[in-house]
Amino acid sequence: MAFPHRLDAPELPDFSMLKRLARDQLIYLLEQLPGKKDLFIEADLMSPLDRIANVSILKQHEVDKLYKVENKPALSANEQLCFLVRPRIKNMRYIASLVNADKLAGRIRKYKVILSPQKFYACEMVLEEEGVYGDVSCDEWAFSLLPLDVDLLSMELPEFFRDYFLEGDQRWINTVAQALHLLSTLYGPFPNCYGIGRCAKMSYDLWRKLEEEEDSETKGRKPEIGHIFLLDRDVDFVTALCSQVVYEGLVDDTFRIKCGSVDFGPEVTSSDKSLKVLLNAEDKVFSEIRNEHFSNVFGFLSQKARNLQAQYDRRRGMDIKQMKNFVSQELKGLKQEHRLLSLHIGACESIMKKKTKQDFQELIKTEHALLEGFNIRESTSYIEEHIDRQVSPIESLRLMCLLSITENGLIPKDYRSLKTQYLQSYGPEHLLTFSNLRRAGLLTEQAPGDTLTAVESKVSKLVTDKAAGKITDAFSSLAKRSNFRAISKKLNLIPRVDGEYDLKVPRDMAYVFSGAYVPLSCRIIEQVLDRRSWQGLDEVVRLLNCSEFAFTDTAKEDKASSESLRLILVVFLGGCTFSEISALRFLGREKGYRFIFLTTAVTNSARLMEAMSEVKS
């Protein structure tokens, strides 16, 4: 059922070391404020912190009470306050207001600010402007890599996507470079590096500088990971905009997986309580169904339930000695498996109910038509009806973006019509969202004679490579065209199927979208790894209108074992989806690779749209 790893599959590195490092550094920072202290934690950091150091660990290091950072006066009576926050201006203003309030009240306390994952000069400037710089000590907790699973690392920076791809803010590039530097320090150098996208190139260049400055740290080390591939999210928006149909992706779309765990409500747990469940390889039931197409999952869970019942029924014919062994060795494991099985069956039933209500089949049919370029008028009518029925503003926006990207922009008549209908249906406050989507290249209007010539492509790429900021704005309209149809043809993203696609025995990565579409990002990775370079992909790179790079260090490659050369680290800048992860796991099984994923955050179509929206729900 699940994709069993090939017997010759390489072993994954042990990433638990990253957790220990992060925990030790945090404890060191907390101990710099000796004695009892209250800890104020920003909401964004609560889940990642829980995976690194739980409440009991914090208590051991004299953290008395925990508070959530909220825009209201602090109720703490402690003489020492510690703040664990993201490096944001609003957080610094909030901390400064608390310090100034204490000053006015004549109260003397000690204050420590721990900024994660990085300390920015602008943050200290705010403290200076507010007149509290001398009262507060500022430190950095360089916690930028959280292992969510054996093969998945997350930087837990969902804001990266909007900051970079909409605002052009490059501050997180240093964080990415530092994270890659940490990985190469711990797990040896990467002999082969590939990448595509402007952000990927900048991250790579900065990382190489860090490597050169501290070359002695990795000198002589045997590489544990043979290849690294950096990829910008805007190289492939289409995959991220599609509805997910693998089990883990559907759970994320339906319940929102946050920091590797999910809150299952009463409709799943069949009780009056919600339950927080960690979803990773340790959950034996989940690990067998996570990468499966949803249509296969119910059958598997039913069979699993029957097998479990048969194991319970074995008790009936046992004598006392056998019963004793059964209770001490097997019963606990069976009960745990039974609990997990009940949860996943409940989750499947809940997903089925929601999807039936939404007419999921019709939605998928429309998406497939958009991907294939068929019945565009019919698909446009479906989107109009979606807007008219006021289904979900996010869902309607997603479909409009998918139509725009697959069609290389909307014809002016359709763009104006859909935009007007949307604003009338959901409210004029969404107007700024349309501006954001246009700037990011997600929802654009075709101009007369709108085609991208080879010359324009080269000029745009040259500017993108050589300069940042304002110069690229002049070329943004060139750089944002998708050319999806041409790329799709070149890379055979829409498989030709003779007869019905067998989702039980998938033949290629397209199974993650019911056999209709191979994720563009995954196909690019596959093609480059097959060639060990970008050779022969010049036309694809031109159509993508991105800068690509490849670098091989033969001296390091010679030191690498054949096993490590089959380990590939894929870095998604701007987020990756569970569908892409499942597709690459499948590719790994087929080709004898093991993929490791590093992402700025796990994303899906709803998160992508919410990041662009100016209307916060």
From Swiss-Prot:
Modified residues (N-acetylalanine): A2
Observed effect of gene inactivation: Increased platelet account and deficiency in platelet alpha-granules associated with bleeding diathesis and decreases aggregate formation; reduction of mature ype-II multivesicular bodies (MVB II) in megakaryocytes.
Record's bilayer topology term: Peripheral membrane protein
Keyword Thylakoid among record annotations: no
Molecular function in Gene Ontology: protein-containing complex binding
GO biological process: collagen fibril organization; collagen metabolic process; endosome organization; intracellular protein transport; lysosome localization; megakaryocyte development; melanosome localization; membrane fusion
Stated role: May play a role in vesicle-mediated protein trafficking to lysosomal compartments and in membrane docking/fusion reactions of late endosomes/lysosomes. Required for proper trafficking and targeting of the collagen-modifying enzyme lysyl hydroxylase 3 (LH3) to intracellular collagen. Mediates phagolysosomal fusion in macrophages. Proposed to be involved in endosomal maturation implicating in part VIPAS39. In epithelial cells, the VPS33B:VIPAS39 complex may play a role in the apical RAB11A-dependentrecycling pathway and in the maintenance of the apical-basolateral polarity.
Protein's recorded name: Vacuolar protein sorting-associated protein 33B
Protein species of origin: Mus musculus
Gene name linked to the record: Vps33b
